[in-house]
């Protein structure tokens, strides 16, 4: 078929990096082996760096190295060797095959046990509280486990204030309301 198929495991444990270059496709599990093969890759990719420095994560395909991308968890790409281009990209999410009903008490027990295990040690634990469901649950359970939850939120300087959307800090506002209602150290 004259194709190369690259896939990454659904959990995203093992990395797969790739780059389209003039000669074809370069790929590997480590970026350092690709740097000499990908022109300009020793320069920083500003989008990836910006994403990481503002949010603490990089959910993009872009890596810090210009021109080198990563496959996302569960992603597969098909590269056409003759035409030197990616012809297909798909992402598969594994769904648990279970007919088990949601048990709120069991969920709470598992969540609390996970928080308890993660908070063992002498270091102080803090939660980045966005005001959303996930961080709210973690902060709430952390308070139940330790007696107090240290939370923090960031407020952003908007580049543009939309007349209807406001200043884009509604998440920070929600987090503050939640922190006050639960007496978090915010």
Where are the model-predicted features located?
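Cysteine-centered catalytic environments shared across enzyme families
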Residues: 1-186
């Amino acid at each position: 078929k004259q194709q190369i198929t690259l896939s990454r495991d659904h959990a995203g444990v093992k990395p797969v990096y790739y780059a389209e270059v003039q000669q074809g496709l370069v790929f590997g599990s480590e970026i350092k082996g690709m740097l000499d093969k990908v022109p300009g890759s020793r320069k920083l990719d500003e989008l990836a760096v910006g994403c990481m420095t503002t949010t603490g994560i990089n959910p993009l395909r872009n890596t810090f190295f210009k021109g080198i991308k990563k496959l996302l968890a569960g992603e597969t790409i098909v590269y056409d060797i003759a035409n030197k281009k990616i012809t297909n990209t798909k992402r598969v999410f594994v769904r648990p095959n279970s007919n088990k009903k949601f048990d709120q008490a069991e969920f709470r027990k598992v969540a609390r046990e996970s928080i308890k295990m993660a908070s063992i040690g002498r270091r102080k634990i803090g939660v980045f509280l966005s005001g959303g469901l996930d961080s709210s649950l973690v902060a709430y359970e952390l308070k139940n486990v330790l007696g107090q939850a240290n939370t923090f939120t960031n407020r952003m300087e908007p580049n543009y204030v939309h007349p209807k959307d406001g200043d884009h800090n509604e998440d920070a506002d929600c987090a503050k309301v939640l922190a006050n209602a639960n007496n978090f150290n915010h």
